[in-house]
Amino acid sequence: MSFNSFGRVFRFSTWGESHGPAIGAVVDGCPPGLELSEADIQPWLDKRRPGTSRFTTQRQEPDQVRILSGVFEGRTTGTPISLMIDNVDQRSKDYSEVALAYRPGHADYAYDAKYGFRDHRGGGRSSARETASRVAAGAVARLVIPEVRIRAYLIELGGDRIDPAAFDDAAIDENPFFCPDRAAAARWEAIVDDARKAGSSVGAVVECVAEGVPAGWGAPLYAKLDSELAAACMSINAVKGVEIGDGFAAARLTGETNADPMRPGNDGKPVFLANHAGGIAGGIATGQPVVVRIALKPTSSILTPVETIGRDGKAADIRTKGRHDPCVGIRAAPVLEAMVALVLADQKLLHRAQIG
C-alpha cells in the first residue's frame, strides 16, 4: 500500500492501524536546531483526543506521544523525526460483522476491491485514528512557521450554521465543538445527542484561517498553494468538499463584487478591502489571511441497519457496533489545523529554496 506520505521538502509519512499496537509519523526535511520535545506536541494531540466528551467516540486513548529520533539535547538534528503513539483501548471483537460485510459509505469495499485483503478492525488504515499521527506531525510543522497563526473551528453541524455576527474567538476553546458561536454550540448538543440516541450520525463544515502567511508563498499553475491545500484537506477522513475563500459562493457573485480592491498602504504594501479569494491569487499567497473550508460527511459507522452486501457478494444488512463519533467533524478541527500547518511549512521551505 503506497501513498502514505505528503509534502515535498517538509515531508511526513504516517504508519499504523486503528487496532494495531501503535500509530505514528516520520517527519523528514525539518530544519535543524529547532527546540522540540513531547511537550510541544502533546497539547495539540489533547485537542483531538477521543473520549473527552459525550459528543465524540468513547474510546479512551491517552494519545501520549514519544519522540524516537531526530532530536538531540532538545533540538532537531535535521534527520528524520520519528513519532509514536501507543494504541491502548481497542475492542476488535466489535468489528466481527465488518469482516464479513461492507459498511456503505466506508472504505471497506473499496479497499477490498483494490487490495483483495484488508484489516477490518476499526477500519485499519482508513480509520480516523490515523489522524492523530497527522496532528503530531503538524505540531512539528508549527515550529517551522512561528510567524503564522492557524485557527480552525466548526461553522456548521447537522445542517445548523453559526451566526457570523456572533463569532467569538474566545468561545472556540470553551465548548467541545470548537464552535465560535455560543448559542450554536448549545443547539449542537441536542443535535448530536439526538443522532447518537437514534444510532445515526451528522456531518459538519469546518473552517480554518491562517494569519501571517507572507505574500509570495506558493507557486503558479500545477503547484498552486490552493491546490496543495485542497489535496491536503481531501486526504482527511470523511472530507467530501473543499473551498478556498468564498469557494462555490463566488460563482453567484459579479466581477465587481468578487474583486478584492486594493489601496496603497503606508509600508508600500497593498491594503486589501476584501478577501473573497481567501488570501491566494494565481496560486500564490497575497499576504491576506488564508481561508480554507472543508465539508465532512456523516460518520459511516452507525447503529442503524443499512442494506449492503457481504464479501461473498450476497445481500446483507449491517449495523456497526463499537464506539464511533456521531459527528466526525467535531474532532476534525485540530486535524485541519495540522494539515494546513504541514502545507505551509513545506511552502515556506520551498519558497526559500526558489527565491533565497
From Swiss-Prot:
Quote the protein name from its UniProt record: Chorismate synthase
Q: Which organism is it from?
A: Rhizorhabdus wittichii (strain DSM 6014 / CCUG 31198 / JCM 15750 / NBRC 105917 / EY 4224 / RW1) (Sphingomonas wittichii)
Similarity annotation: Belongs to the chorismate synthase family.
How cofactor binds (record note)? Reduced FMN (FMNH(2)).
Q: Which cofactor does it need?
A: FMNH2
Subunit relationships = Homotetramer.
SUPFAM superfamilies on file:
Chorismate synthase, AroC
Q: What are the BP-aspect GO terms?
A: amino acid biosynthetic process; aromatic amino acid family biosynthetic process; chorismate biosynthetic process
Catalytic activity annotated for this protein? 5-O-(1-carboxyvinyl)-3-phosphoshikimate = chorismate + phosphate
Asked if the keyword Kinase belongs to this entry, the reply reads: no
Q: Which residues are FMN-binding?
A: 125-127, 237-238, 282, 297-301, 323
The record, for Pfam families, names:
Chorismate_synt (PF01264)
Which pathway does the database say it acts in?
Metabolic intermediate biosynthesis; chorismate biosynthesis; chorismate from D-erythrose 4-phosphate and phosphoenolpyruvate: step 7/7
HAMAP family named among the record's database cross-references: Chorismate_synth (MF_00300)
Q: Gene3D superfamilies this protein is in?
A: Chorismate synthase AroC (3.60.150.10)
Entry keyword set: Amino-acid biosynthesis, Aromatic amino acid biosynthesis, FAD, Flavoprotein, FMN, Lyase, NADP
Recorded E.C. number(s)?
4.2.3.5
Single GO MF annotation: FMN binding
Function of the molecule: This reaction introduces a second double bond into the aromatic ring system.
Which GO CC terms are listed, alphabetically? cytosol
- Alphabetized InterPro entries for the sequence: Chorismate_synth (IPR000453), Chorismate_synth_AroC_sf (IPR035904), Chorismate_synthase_CS (IPR020541)
Give the binding site residues for NADP(+).
Answer: 48, 54
TM ranges: none
The superkingdom of the source organism is Bacteria
